[in-house]
From Swiss-Prot:
Alphabetized CDD domains for the sequence: 5TM_YidC_Alb3, EcYidC-like_peri
Superkingdom as given in the UniProt entry: Bacteria
Pfam families (alphabetical): 60KD_IMP, YidC_periplas
Location within or outside the cell: Cell inner membrane
Xref: InterPro entries: Membr_insert_YidC, Membr_insert_YidC_N, YidC/ALB3/OXA1/COX18, YidC/Oxa/ALB_C, YidC_ALB_C, YidC_periplasmic_sf
Topology of the protein relative to the lipid bilayer: Multi-pass membrane protein
Family in the record: Belongs to the OXA1/ALB3/YidC family. Type 1 subfamily.
Role summary: Required for the insertion and/or proper folding and/or complex formation of integral membrane proteins into the membrane. Involved in integration of membrane proteins that insert both dependently and independently of the Sec translocase complex, as well as at least some lipoproteins. Aids folding of multispanning membrane proteins.
Keyword Metal-binding attributed: no
Listed name of the protein: Membrane protein insertase YidC
Keyword tags: Cell inner membrane, Cell membrane, Chaperone, Membrane, Protein transport, Transmembrane, Transmembrane helix, Transport
One term under GO cellular component: plasma membrane
One GO MF term attached to the UniProt entry: membrane insertase activity
Organism of derivation: Citrifermentans bemidjiense (strain ATCC BAA-1014 / DSM 16622 / JCM 12645 / Bem)
Amino acid sequence: MEKRLIIAVLLSIGVLYAYSFIFPTPKPLTAPGAKQAAMSSASAPALPAAVAPTAGTAPLAAPAPQAGQAPAVAKDVTVDTDLYTAVFSTQGGGLKKFVLKKYKETVGPQGKDIVLVNETAANRYALLSDSREFGLSPDALYSASTGEVKVTNGGKGSLEFTTTTSQGITFRKVYTFSGDAYRIGLTEEVQNAGNVALTGAVHLLQTSRVVEAKKEGRYEVHAPSTLSEGKVKVDKLDNLLKNPVQYGKDIAWSAFADKYFMDGIIADKGSISQVRITRPANDAIQRDIVSPTVTVAPGQRSAVNYAVYYGPKDLDILKLQGNRLDEVIDYGWFGPIAKPLVHSLKFLYKYTGNYGIAIIIITFILKLVFFPLTHKSYKSMKDMQKLQPKMTELKEKFKNDRDAMNRAVMELYKTHKVNPLGGCLPMVVQIPVFFGLYRALMYSIELRHAPFYLWITDLSAKDPYYVTPIIMGVTMFIQQKMTPTNMDPVQAKMMLMLPIVFTFMFLNFPSGLVIYWLVNNVLTIAQQMYINKAVAD
């Protein structure tokens, strides 16, 4: 097979792969895997000073007459930090609303804050607790330790909800907050003030909102995932309409994420035994996070810890949460390439203050790294081009004997020390880097609403006037015209269609990715001019 045909095939495959990566089939939305709360009959974990328990195995003092007695009407409790505002309810001790302060829905001063939780999803709050064995209802009314929590400048705060069940169980939910972190601590504690030992598990019901998938914006990717048995498993929303999903081994976390934001429940020391995912309504999914079964003797207590995360899918922030939560960002097969590129972008941004400039610098660096391979590729193409007249003679001479022609061609390559794949293989090596950079740019929250210059105000969105993709197509055409070729006329025409195909594909690409491809083309043209001159000399 001629070298040019191989290149044509590889480029065609590359186009198909690029198209599938750029326009993936929208993933059905599903609820993040529910996390199980591990109930240990050992000592209760440390709680804020205002609610610190006695030793885990010590008998509990009988509660005061009003202890755990909840008000008849549900009330809201607002938690305000530097990063978010959360509204909890004494109904279920659940999360009613969660608003991010640092991120907006749209570009510009009129953009509203991102809302990750609202009360409309299946008419259920998030982070509700349920246990039939302990007589606890998810809609139970709790008493709150305070009516408002305000945490700033890296300070700490806490909120405690308490209720008493008909079985004589006092149930406490304690949230702990940091002014400078999205991570929220959650402790659920069962205290048995009755006369009979009770056995059961506590369920943490996490409801997440489902939004119709869209081609552009944060809901382009919208799905739940669970890290179970060492693997990240993503569930499809359509399947959940008929069949709930359950995980029951080595659960580290469960999350529900769109393209840029997520909510997640992170296990603490095996605190999750099962995760059950259902779709109770079209606009919601629910994760039932089940704790291991535990027996609580009279006068004893048992507690379980989680970390709750509501916030951006920032690679560095998620890495700090532990339990491999950063793997909620799906870079696919190209993760080992994409992650270093993301870190490189963030590093360069510290010095440039502009992610567009950072992309250009990375493009230039990659071009330098691959220059030896590219030089070798173009030199091989030039050598093949010089042999084209002799190749034509051999084809004419052995037109009726294909085997003889192939032997003669191989002998020609050997005589002139030409590798027919020499111009192709160096380019193939660069393909994983391109897709790795594509994934890095496509799913980096850092590029969301990040401006470049002039009319490009959001590097994660398409060019509103299509200027950069059109220029990119022109540079790709120029690049192809400068590239040595020994194709027949039909193949040459097919290759000239690629700039047109790529231009239409890139019309809806994030402008950050278009800038990369455009700058790469310009550098390739300059490189080709240099190589052509060097070869001629």
